[in-house]
């Protein structure tokens, strides 16, 4: 009898511990405010997965190949707003992991891969408190083992690209980036990382700066793209 009583007591204590742990781990989903154990609730995770591209490497060609995890619509579009304007940084870590997992499954291994996130200007960084591209890139590197490099800086403040024509976008970011105290050397394979790709004006401007230093930019990886072709 004592052994049975002791076993029952241990089992009850373990159940209480697990319940307390689950309560501690639970949080509110940043997208819908439902209770969630993971970063987002299961419902919102499914909504995000529905935006995933069947072939993330469908645009991996040309002068600056593009690798895009998803389509910039629906829950991805809404979650990006929550990330950048409501400060839900955990969303960046979620997308960094999704992008990294997809990259590892879809792309051949690239030797000496160095990841450079598209930087924010110092004024925007101070206002927002973080650079979403850098958070995504940090998680990407953590999963893939790629090296993170932060020597690229945005030296000139630019207006938001949204609503600008293609030519105006190119003019807006021209001369806005520079390498500062960089230790990058020729022979490295550089992958640019950003949250969203629309016309590509920003990443092309960055690639031009890096290539002017005889650095090889193999492409750009983003969470989502608005391309329809």
PLM regions with names:
Residues 1-229:
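Glycine-rich phosphate/pyrophosphate-handling loop used in enzymes and phosphotransfer proteins
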């Amino acid at each position: 009898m004592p052994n049975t009583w002791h076993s029952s007591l241990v089992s009850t204590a373990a159940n209480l511990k697990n319940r307390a742990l689950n309560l501690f781990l639970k949080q509110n989903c940043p997208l819908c405010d439902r209770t969630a154990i993971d970063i987002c609730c299961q419902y919102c995770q499914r909504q995000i997965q529905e935006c995933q591209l069947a072939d993330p490497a469908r645009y991996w060609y040309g002068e600056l190949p593009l690798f895009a995890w998803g389509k910039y619509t629906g829950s991805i579009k809404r979650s990006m707003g929550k990330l950048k304007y409501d400060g839900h940084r955990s969303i960046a870590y979620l997308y960094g992991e999704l992008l990294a997992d997809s990259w590892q499954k879809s792309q051949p291994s690239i030797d000496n891969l160095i990841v450079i996130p598209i930087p924010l200007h110092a004024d925007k960084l101070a206002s927002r408190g973080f650079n979403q591209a850098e958070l995504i890139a940090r998680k990407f590197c953590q999963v893939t083992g790629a090296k993170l490099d932060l020597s690229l800086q945005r030296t000139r403040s630019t207006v938001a690209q949204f609503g600008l024509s293609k030519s105006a976008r190119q003019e807006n970011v021209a001369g806005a980036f520079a390498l500062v105290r960089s230790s990058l050397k020729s022979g490295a394979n550089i992958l640019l990382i950003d949250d969203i790709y629309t016309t590509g004006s920003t990443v092309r401007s960055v690639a031009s700066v890096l290539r002017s230093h005889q650095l090889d930019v193999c492409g750009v990886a983003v969470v989502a793209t608005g391309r329809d072709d």
